[in-house]
Amino acid sequence: MTQLEKKHCVPCEGTEAPMAPEELQRQLSHIPDWNVVDDSGTPKLVRVFTFKDFNDALDFTVRVGQLAESEGHHPALLTEWGKVTVSWWTHAIGGIHLNDVIMATKTEKLV
């Protein structure tokens, strides 16, 4: 278990700055299958998970939802036949926070 897996999300009130690019690059080394995607000026951590069918994709979506509820931090989820796209970012700051890296790390363990 990594240190990030042991951490929990902290409430973000919107006064924090998004993660600095250098720190984000360092954190990405812990989650190499995730990409930073610019979505209309908002950076997001994104990964596409693949599954054998829709039911497996849906089961994974539910597990991500349960994790999100337990941590009080919620992603965008796109569930399709055989794949789920998970996007983590912090709405309140319009960018990526350590909470998002923590959640991406925890999401990895749900597969």
Swiss-Prot record:
| EC number(s) reported in the record | 4.2.1.96
Name one process (GO BP) from the record: tetrahydrobiopterin biosynthetic process
Known catalytic reactions: (4aS,6R)-4a-hydroxy-L-erythro-5,6,7,8-tetrahydrobiopterin = (6R)-L-erythro-6,7-dihydrobiopterin + H2O
Spell out the Gene3D superfamilies in the cross-references. Answer: Transcriptional coactivator/pterin dehydratase
Q: Which InterPro entries match?
A: PCD_sf, Pterin-4-alpha-carb_dehyd, Pterin_deHydtase
- Keywords, A to Z? Lyase
Q: Name one GO molecular function term.
A: 4-alpha-hydroxytetrahydrobiopterin dehydratase activity
Family label:
Belongs to the pterin-4-alpha-carbinolamine dehydratase family.
PANTHER family (UniProt xref): PTERIN-4-ALPHA-CARBINOLAMINE DEHYDRATASE-RELATED
Name the UniProt record assigns to this protein: Putative pterin-4-alpha-carbinolamine dehydratase
Species, as recorded: Chlorobaculum parvum (strain DSM 263 / NCIMB 8327) (Chlorobium vibrioforme subsp. thiosulfatophilum)
Taxon lineage: Bacteria, Pseudomonadati, Chlorobiota, Chlorobiia, Chlorobiales
